[in-house]
Amino acid sequence: MKTLILFSTRDGQTREIASYLASELKDMGIWADVVNLHRAEEPDWDSYDRVVIGASIRYGHYHSAFQEFVKKYATRLNGMPSAFYSVNLVARKAEKRTPQTNSYARKFLMSSPWRPDYCAVIAGALRYPRYRWYDRLMIKLIMKMSGGETDTSKEVVYTDWEQVAHFAREIAHLTNKSSAK
């Protein structure tokens, strides 16, 4: 069994989550290729039993390359077991960590031609020292308005790694379902 994990990241946390998922899956005997969606050519879909795509939010939007990829390959994505994870800082609040309660994930899923079998909303990381001055200022303003961390000397990882491990187990279950057909 082999899994394709594609990610769209801006500051690296979505890639970290993709790598963690691959490690968890490997521990379950499932091999995974982790690929940056921004650098990916068309996947060899037939080489994989399922696909997972992760995408991060910046200033309220997913990267356009992610949106275009999903539109271009929706038929392929819908034709195999698939999962989606959204990474954003709103999800640092536990009540905003489901596709139903997270507005970014909900809007994407409602408008997307892709219908993943399983979805997760995962909190990202706040990495002020790594941001350009403009991003640091804007993100600080957003965090102040939403009651988040505003100390620009800090890096805070909000990702709940046990939630990511649970997501990996759900992904493994998707593979088992598809092989039972």
Curated annotation (Swiss-Prot):
Binding residues annotated for FMN, in chain numbering: 9-13, 84-152
Annotated metabolic or biological route of this protein: Porphyrin-containing compound metabolism; protoporphyrin-IX biosynthesis; protoporphyrin-IX from protoporphyrinogen-IX: step 1/1
Keyword Hydrolase: no
Cofactor(s) recorded in Swiss-Prot or TrEMBL: FMN
Gene Ontology BP annotations: heme biosynthetic process; protoporphyrinogen IX biosynthetic process
Location in or out of the cell: Cell inner membrane
Function comment: Catalyzes the 6-electron oxidation of protoporphyrinogen IX to form protoporphyrin IX; under anaerobic conditions uses menaquinone as an electron acceptor, under aerobic condition uses ubiquinone as an electron acceptor.
PANTHER family according to UniProt: PROTOPORPHYRINOGEN IX DEHYDROGENASE [MENAQUINONE] (PTHR38030), PROTOPORPHYRINOGEN IX DEHYDROGENASE [QUINONE] (PTHR38030:SF2)
Protein name (database record): Protoporphyrinogen IX dehydrogenase [quinone]
Organism encoding this protein: Salmonella typhimurium (strain LT2 / SGSC1412 / ATCC 700720)
Gene name for this UniProt entry: hemG
